[in-house]
């Protein structure tokens, strides 16, 4: 359906692990593009058995490159394998509900109807192919770095833990084990490129230990290993604690070692993201970029400016000042008490009129600080 030619041209050192990782990602993305074309052809032929098989193959292949795409353009991936619901975007001061696209939409078209909706499946395949080609072109013309590669690895592990294990991104097929194993295979491959580059460095030992951990995690997911029979019997908490968390912790250690061993990369590692890359698992209290302690914050409106002690002190003063209200009776703290997780603990929020209440409660502003970035 689509033919893509690539020369893998880049100004970076063609022997560097970041360049080799980029080349590998392009190859896997092109393969994913072909798998989607195979699905398109099966739908065009009204092959009900082939559509199911080609769909599963296409998404498993996509999982090999998903982590890399996340590090480039996270908004891109939600239109490839995001939930089959309209995405709310804030555009020009208004709200725009965008139509969902991607693998999960196809999943519903195949399994949630009496018979596959072949025309719509073909439309979705066309959309995915078009987006893959767009992204191939973006990757080819943009240089990469160790910083972006390791950010992608971290994103990949987060996606496994938050989306793949609970089957959030494969809710009907429930092919959790196969898709996680595919993601881990790709992560292991990329880490291997760094093993080759750092063979004479202390980092090498940690890299090889991480590769061993990944292989053990993949083995756990193999049906022949006998650890589970189906999605329901998969011990998800055990898999997270025994396998994913140690892998994630080692990725952070490797990341730090490369930063130390290669001083020129220090500046590249400091660009702002919405997660704390030093957090070793998603349950770390500082997993999200902490605007109270960070020099700069992804979640701050002025994220390009340093959060100085004076700015923080001013914010606290304004937060507690009743004089900013209409009748000098209320402050932000009135409805968002720090002692109550910045909520009010009431069924319905109070107003500045005695005995009158709002139609709803006052939600914690901790969530409000993250909402615009996390849920759009």
Where are these regions (language model features)?
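Bacterial Sec-dependent N-terminal signal peptides
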Residues: 1-14
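Mature extracytoplasmic or organellar-lumen-exposed domains after removal of signal/transit peptides
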Residues: 11-291
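Electrostatic cytochrome c docking/interface patches
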Residues: 21-24, 41-42, 47-48, 296-324
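Short helix-capping and inter-helix turn/linker motifs at the boundaries of alpha-helical repeat units
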Residues: 29-30, 305-309, 356
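The canonical Cys-X-X-Cys-His
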Residues: 58, 315-339, 365
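Amphipathic alpha-helical interaction segments
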Residues: 62-72, 325-326, 339-343, 372
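Active-site-proximal structural scaffolding
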Residues: 180, 240, 308, 325-328, ...
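Electron-transfer interface patches adjacent to heme c in soluble/periplasmic c-type cytochromes
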Residues: 275-278, 282-304, 326-330, 341-376
